Every structure is written in C-alpha cells, then in structure tokens.
Amino acid sequence: MQLGFAIDQRTCIGCHACTVACKTENDVPVGQFRTWVKYVDSGEFPDTTRSFGVMRCNHCTDAPCVKICPTQALFKRDDGIVDFDNERCIGCKSCMQACPYDAIYIDAQTNTAAKCNLCAHRVDNDLEPACVVVCPTHSIWVGDLDDPTSGISKLVSTHQTAVRTPEQNTGPNVFYLGADQAVLDPLAAPVDDTYIWAKPDAHRLETAGDLPGNPRKGSRTTLNTAHPRPWGWKVVTYLWTKGIGAGALAVAGLAILLGIDFGVLGDYVAPALAIFGAATTGALLVLDLKRPERFLYLFLKSNFSSWLVLGGYVLTLFTGGSMLWILAAALEIGWAMTTLAWLSIPASVLMAGYTAFLFGQAEGRDLWQSPVLFWHLQAQAVMVGSGALAVAGLFLDLSDEAWTLVIGAFVVATVAHLVILLVEYAGKHASRQAATAAHVITSGRYAKTFWMGSVVPTVLAAIAGAVAWAMGADTTSTVLVALAGLVVQPALLAYESVFVRAGQDMPLS
C-alpha cells in the first residue's frame, strides 16, 4: 500500500484553501507551512500567464529523510505515509538537507522537525486529509497508488503526469497533472525584487541572481515561502576542527610506524590536538541542535542507517583512542603505542571522511554529492593537521627526520587539496543544481572569498612548504612551514564556508 497525492494544476485556482486548512488542522505556526501554493508568472505584458503549484512532502517510496534521521523520528508507515514523531526529534536539521523538496521545517513551537504527514490522524479514522476536503475544485486527489482500482491510480495511469526532481530517484508519490515545468523546476523561475503581495525573504533575494532561469519564457516566481539555510557557521567550523584532529593523529601514527621519533609532539601534542578536534566537533554539533538537551538520543534511539549516528560513534571512539594514546605514552608502553599507531590510520580516515557519507545522504544538496569529497576531506585533514603540528614543532626539539615528515605530509596534502579543487570545480557536475552552485563559488557571489580567501593563500602556503622541503630541516625552513601551516587554517575555513553555504543556496521548491 502506498498512499499519495495527485495535484491537478489544470483546475487549481491558487486560492490557498489547502494551505489554510492544513495550518488550521495541524496548528502550524505563523510563517511556516506543510503545504503551500507557489505562483510563477511567465511572458511579458500583455502576453502573460500565471501558473500555480501546490508544494508539499512527496511521501517518497525511498525517503532520504528517513535514512538520514539519527533517532528514527521520521519513519515510513505501512500505508506509505512518511510520518514524524516529535518526541524523538533532536532538531539536527539533517532531514531538511536530505529532502529534495523543501518539505521539512523546524516547528517554531516545539523546535522539532515537522512536515505534511498526509493528516495521518485523519487517515487513521477513515477521513481524507484536510486539504483534500477543502479544495473547491477537487484539484487534490488522495488514495492508494498501489491499488489499480482506486480513483487516484486511474487518474495517474490515464493522464500524463510529472513529478518534482525525478533525477533524485526518491520515488516521489505526489503526481502533477498539467503543471508548468517552471513551477516544478526550482531553478527555472528566480524571484524578482518583489512578490505580488510582499517582499521575498532575504535569502531568496540574495540567491535570485545565481539562478539560470528560462530566458525564452521569462518566468519568475511571484509567490513562495521562505526556506533559510539550515546549517551555518557551526557546521563550517566542525569540518575544520575534526580535520585538525584527524590529520594530526594520522601523521603522528605514521611517524611511529616509520620508526621516526616525534618526541613530545607525537606522544602528547598530536593526541591532544586529536582530542581537542573531536571534543570541539562534538560540542559544535550539540550546540547546533534545536533540542540540545536530547543529544543522548543519538545513542539511545539510534538509526544505524544514518551517518550522523555512525559519525557520533566515530567521534566517541576516536576521542577514547586519543586518550589511551596519551596514557600509553606517559606509561611508556611501547607495544600499546605501536598498536594505537596502527589503529590511528583507519580511525583518522574515518574521522576525517565520515562527513562525505553524511553529505552523501543529503539528497537535497547536489553540490555535496561529489564522488571526490571523501578524498578531499582526507587531504584537507592532513593539510591542517600537519600544519598545526608544524606550528607546535617550533616550540619543541624535533629531529630532522621528524621535521622532514611533517613538512612532506603538509606539502603533499596541500597540493592534493588544490588538485582536487581543480578537478571539482573545473570538471562537469552531475546535475544543474551542482553546476549552478559550483559556478556561484568560482564566478558568482562567493568568488572573492573562494579565490582570495582560500585558493591564493593555499597556493602560497604550498609553495612555501615546497621551498622548506627543498631546503631541508633548518631553522629557516621550519619557520617557513610553520607560517604556511598557520595560513592554511583560515584558508580552509574560508573554503568550507562557501562550500557549505553554496550547497544550501540552491532552491528546492
């Protein structure tokens, strides 16, 4: 059984009765919506048209929000409804990143995720959803799409229909009849400086110039709802802090396996950086929750298909291993140090790279779906981790061998980071969403931050590191690589800032 909707835009009059009925039935806060009507105007006066599109959750067959939700607060019922339990929700907002339809919001009253649930409480009592009942033109159909005898199945099977973003392969169960493609395609109709009754929200105005639009039709959105970026500076910073921790421990572990004595830098500084990185990362993630008091639900109500949960376990185990490292060094237990060194490599790889799998579950953010992101995170981690070790090494007595390893790791990782940037932004992208976001980074609103704040300083740091490597481990080279190690820290933060923001700037509705 799969309950779903069919929206007949041929008969929809854009009256908003469905929106009002939904808000009343479900006590939806002011300014938030489970269903809404989007207006798109096309053409030029006097040859203009206005198209409507009823937007809502698509109750996907393969719902990405269910997969990414760390606490099973979102779940798929036996009747196909994607429902939510706000008693389990921690407000991590990952579901908002996973949904390609802008259907999920954080309820202002409960600080938990909410969305259209097909009025499940009414369905359970053999009643139709409120929007279906109130629609004056019977433009909203509901029923079992798996039952060929149902009215909705007959309607869908006998008419040409369309779905939103079919390329995401989520199996959407909201079918549109007679909908203008400019309504369904979020890139086709940017906003102007005003809606028909109000100003667009600041985020839509900020990003309107990024969108390619449809020059032939001149389509523009004249009514829509606000969808601000769910993730901000805390997630940007988290990408940097966990990179420092993972990279520092990986280089120290490699030194032990190669028989290079790092002294205090390897015994205490590297694991301390690892603990700092992991602990700060965890703190940032908890602070970013809308219900931070529920953070333990991540472990008590776990959904093990979510990389938020798996990442939480990686952070915990990584921190524990780093603490054991310091203990083994203090007690001078050689075999334990060797064992931990072997374990540090895969642990650091997971620590740095699990975000690639988490972002891979964020189906609504095509820029983040990069096939090279995992390797990019590894290069970034070693770059900032070895850079931090180089700075600390200035104040410690390091052998020439140790300096050579730190400098070499820094140069190789920094060059790898730059090469992957070239591959990522000079190559083709898998979707228009990703290509548009990449263009915004390299040539649009974020170009100055990307080039002058990140790429140029990183190139200079790579050159400085290469010169230091060629000079050998003397006082000048160590100071040079330490300065380069300092430079790449804000440079990486600048890149992560535009990467995280641009991925969320592409509209989904």
Show the residue positions of the predicted features.
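Ferredoxin-type iron-sulfur electron-transfer modules and their immediate structural context
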Residues: 1-82, 87-90, 96-98, 102
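Flanking helices and flexible, charged tails adjoining ferredoxin-like Fe-S electron-transfer domains
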Residues: 41-56, 87-88, 96-98, 102-226
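Secondary-structure capping and boundary motifs in well-ordered enzyme cores
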Residues: 61, 87-91, 108, 127, ...
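N-terminal signal-anchor module of multipass membrane proteins
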Residues: 197-261, 502
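Long, contiguous internal "core" modules enriched in hydrophobic/ aromatic residues
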Residues: 230-233, 237-244, 256-262, 303-306, ...
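Membrane helical hairpin/interfacial module
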Residues: 251-314, 321
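Juxtamembrane/interface segments at transmembrane-helix termini
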Residues: 289-290, 422-427, 497-508
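Multi-pass alpha-helical membrane architecture of UbiA-family
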Residues: 297, 301, 439-443, 503-509
